[in-house]
Structure formats: structure tokens, C-alpha cells
């Protein structure tokens, strides 16, 4: 296999060859220069001018002087130095500087409003000593007058008429009938409960029951059936309207009557669930 020479070897060979060629050229040139200096210069060649001298040309001293004087080179008149004319200064061109753009005037800042000075708190004035003035008790003149009138009525014998007696008897009979009717109706709703217990419950409710004025003005009547539970400790719970044939005004009045009369109910031996009808009527006796 052929091995190609390395690039380093090739570069060395090329440099050596170039050195030898340059050395040979310098040697040839130097030899030519030496040979040219040793060669004699040729005589005047054709076309050269001959210089001839005659004796007549030699004159006396005067001539020599004149010749010498003439030989002297004429001094050229010195040139007067030219006055340097003052250079006219060229008028400088006024460079007009560009006018600066007017800066926009800053907008005047709004002056901050002066904060209102806090008003000095008024010093608390010393409270004037309040002299305890005994309030004059209102005169009990009207009460005394009422008491006198009652005393007169008591002292004066009442004239009882037969009509009044009849009315009182009718009222008692009607109240007995209503109580009997109420107890009988209550017994119908509460079987197994004693009449005495129911009577106490009804009397307590009637003592706290109020006929609402709004219902009276509107002429509202009706009956509300209320159920509730009396516990052994005397507390009353689960109060609600079971049945009603009237408006919410009387329903609310019936519930309030049970709540306000609860503390008057007798304590049962065991927990009792009751249903009590409460009637509202505008009929006069």
C-alpha cells in the first residue's frame, strides 16, 4: 500500500525549494552588477560638443575685472515682501438656533383644602346639684269623692225591682246551662277525665280568655277546638288548634288563653291529653 506524505513534510520540502530558487536569482543579479562596474566608459560619442579657446579671448586686468565682474552673478533684486493684506473676516453666519419649544405650563395643582380645625370640645359643665324636691303627692280628691258616692249608695237602700231579680235568675240559669254544655262537650272530647278536673280547666281558661276588639268590631264569632298536654309536673305542652270555624284572630286568642291560664291548671297524677272547645259569641244576655 502507498503511504502519502504527511502535510508537515510537504511544507518543509516546498520551503526548501523556494529558498534555493531565490538564492540563485540573487547570485545572478549580484554577479551582473560587478561585471558592469569594471567595464571602461567609452569616449565621447558622436553628437558631443567640443570646447575651443582663443588667445584673443584673454584680455587685460580690466577685462579680467570686467569679466570677473561680469562673471559675478547678478544679484537678483530682492522682492519686497508683499504686505499681507488683512484678510477680510467673513461675516460669521449667524447660526439661528432652533427656538426651544415652549414647555407646557404645568397645570396648577389644586390647593388642598385646609382641614377644618377640630372644634374644641366644650368642657363638661359641672352638673348643678339637684336638690331633691319632694314631689307633692297628687291629691286624692277624686278617690275620696268616689268613696263618698259608694258610701251613699251603700247607705241608701237599693230599690230592687222584680225585673232585676228575673234578669239575675236568667243569667244564672244561662251560665249554668253554658257551663253544663261546655263540660258535656268537653267530656265528649275527653272521655275518661273527671268532670271536676275539666271544670277547673275551663274556669281557668275563661278567666284568662279575652274577646279581641277587632273581632267584636267586625262581628266575628265562632268556636275553636284547642288541644294540649298537661304533664305530671304541671307543665303544659303541645298547644295547638285542632278544629276551627272562624278566623285567625279568634284562633290566636284561644291559644293565648290556654298559655296564660296554664299555671292555673290542676296537676294531674299522670300526663293528660285534653281537647277543650272555646266559643266566642256576641249575643247579649
Swiss-Prot record:
Domain TonB C-terminal intervals: 196-285
GO cellular component, one term: outer membrane-bounded periplasmic space
Bias (Basic and acidic residues) ranges: 71-97, 112-156, 164-177
Membrane topology listed for this record: Single-pass membrane protein
Regions crossing the membrane: 15-35
Record bears the keyword Transmembrane: yes
GO biological process: protein transport; siderophore transport; transmembrane transport
Record carries keyword Transmembrane: yes
Subcellular location: Cell inner membrane
Composition bias type Basic residues, residue spans: 98-111
Single GO term (MF): energy transducer activity
InterPro entries (alphabetical): TonB, TonB-dependent_transducer, TonB/TolA_C, TonB_C
Biased composition, class Polar residues, residue ranges: 55-69, 178-187
NCBIfam families per UniProt: tonB_Cterm
Record-stated family: Belongs to the TonB family.
Functional summary from the UniProt entry: Interacts with outer membrane receptor proteins that carry out high-affinity binding and energy dependent uptake into the periplasmic space of specific substrates. It could act to transduce energy from the cytoplasmic membrane to specific energy-requiring processes in the outer membrane, resulting in the release into the periplasm of ligands bound by these outer membrane proteins.
PANTHER family for this protein: PROTEIN TONB, PROTEIN TONB-RELATED
Protein name: Protein TonB
Native organism: Helicobacter pylori (strain ATCC 700392 / 26695) (Campylobacter pylori)
Lineage: Bacteria, Pseudomonadati, Campylobacterota, Epsilonproteobacteria, Campylobacterales
Amino acid at each position: 500500500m502507498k503511504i502519502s506524505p504527511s502535510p508537515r513534510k510537504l511544507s518543509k520540502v516546498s520551503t526548501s525549494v523556494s529558498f534555493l530558487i531565490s538564492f540563485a536569482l540573487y547570485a545572478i543579479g549580484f554577479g551582473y552588477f560587478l561585471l558592469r562596474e569594471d567595464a571602461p566608459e567609452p569616449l565621447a560619442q558622436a553628437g558631443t560638443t567640443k570646447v575651443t579657446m582663443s588667445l584673443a579671448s584673454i584680455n587685460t586686468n580690466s577685462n579680467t575685472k570686467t569679466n570677473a565682474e561680469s562673471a559675478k552673478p547678478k544679484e537678483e533684486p530682492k522682492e519686497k515682501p508683499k504686505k499681507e493684506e488683512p484678510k477680510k473676516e467673513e461675516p460669521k453666519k449667524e447660526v439661528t438656533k432652533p427656538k426651544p419649544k415652549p414647555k407646557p405650563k404645568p397645570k396648577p395643582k389644586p390647593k388642598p383644602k385646609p382641614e377644618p380645625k377640630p372644634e374644641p370640645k366644650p368642657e363638661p359643665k359641672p352638673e348643678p346639684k339637684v336638690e331633691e324636691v319632694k314631689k307633692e303627692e297628687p291629691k286624692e280628691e277624686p278617690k275620696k269623692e268616689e268613696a263618698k258616692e259608694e258610701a251613699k249608695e251603700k247607705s241608701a237602700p237599693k230599690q230592687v225591682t222584680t225585673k232585676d231579680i228575673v234578669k239575675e235568675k236568667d243569667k244564672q240559669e244561662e251560665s249554668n246551662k253554658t257551663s253544663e254544655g261546655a263540660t258535656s262537650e268537653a267530656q265528649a272530647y275527653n272521655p275518661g277525665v273527671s268532670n271536676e278536673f275539666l271544670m277547673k280547666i275551663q274556669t281557668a281558661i275563661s278567666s284568662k280568655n279575652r274577646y279581641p276588639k277587632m273581632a267584636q268590631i267586625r262581628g266575628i264569632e265562632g268556636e275553636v277546638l284547642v288541644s294540649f298536654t298537661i304533664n305530671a309536673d304541671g307543665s303544659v305542652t303541645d298547644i295547638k288548634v285542632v278544629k276551627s270555624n272562624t278566623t285567625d284572630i279568634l284562633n290566636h286568642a284561644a291559644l293565648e288563653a290556654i298559655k296564660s291560664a296554664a299555671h292555673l291548671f290542676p296537676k294531674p297524677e299522670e300526663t293528660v291529653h285534653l281537647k277543650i272547645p272555646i266559643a266566642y259569641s256576641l249575643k247579649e244576655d
